[in-house]
Regions:
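Short cysteine-rich clusters marking metal-coordination/redox-active sites
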Residues: 89, 101-104
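Short metal-binding segments enriched for Cys and/or His
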Residues: 111-119
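Cys/His-enriched microdomains
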Residues: 84-87, 99
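Flexible, glycine/small-residue-enriched loop-and-beta-strand segment within the central core
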Residues: 1-54, 86-87
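Short, non-ligating residues that shape and space the ligands of small metal-coordination modules
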Residues: 95-98, 109-111
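Glycine/proline-rich active-site loop of Rossmann-fold NAD(P)-dependent oxidoreductases
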Residues: 71
Length: 119
C-alpha cells in the first residue's frame, strides 16, 4: 500500500518498505504514507526504506542500509542510517563525492540535470 515503483528498478532480496510513520499495535486510525522508487534505481539486499521517502532516478542504496530521507538522482547512500557517500552514473560507474570515478579517475559533472563524463 502506497508503494510506487517505476521502470527498470532493482530491488534486492529481503528489502523492507514501511508505510506508516507511527505504527502502533492497536491503532485503527493509521495513516499510510507513499514511497516512490524512481526509474533505474537500485536497492541492495536487506535495505529498509522508511515511509514517505523517494529514491531518485538511478540512485543506489547499499545492502543493509536504512533510508530515513529522500535520496536524489544518481546518489549513492550506504549505512545505518544511510549516509550520502558518492554518486553512480546511469551506466553504473561509481563516483566519489567530487564526481570522480573511483576506478578510472575520470571527472564527471551534472549537465542539464544529467550526470555526464567531462570531455
Amino acid at each position: 500500500d502506497g508503494l510506487i515503483i517505476k521502470d527498470d528498478v532493482f530491488i534486492g532480496p529481503n528489502v523492507t518498505f514501511t508505510n506508516d510513520m507511527n505504527p502502533r499495535s492497536k491503532n485503527v486510525d493509521y495513516n499510510l504514507v507513499s514511497t516512490t522508487i524512481k526509474k533505474g534505481a537500485s536497492i541492495g539486499a536487506n535495505a529498509t526504506i522508511l515511509a514517505g521517502n523517494e529514491i531518485g532516478e538511478y540512485a543506489m542504496i547499499g545492502a543493509g542500509s536504512v533510508v530515513t530521507k529522500t535520496i536524489g538522482k544518481n546518489e549513492l547512500w550506504v549505512g545505518n542510517p544511510a549516509k550520502h557517500s558518492g554518486y553512480i552514473t546511469n551506466e553504473g560507474v561509481l563516483l566519489d563525492m567530487n564526481l570522480v570515478s573511483k576506478e578510472t579517475g575520470k571527472q564527471y559533472a551534472f549537465l542539464n540535470s544529467e550526470l555526464r563524463e567531462n570531455d
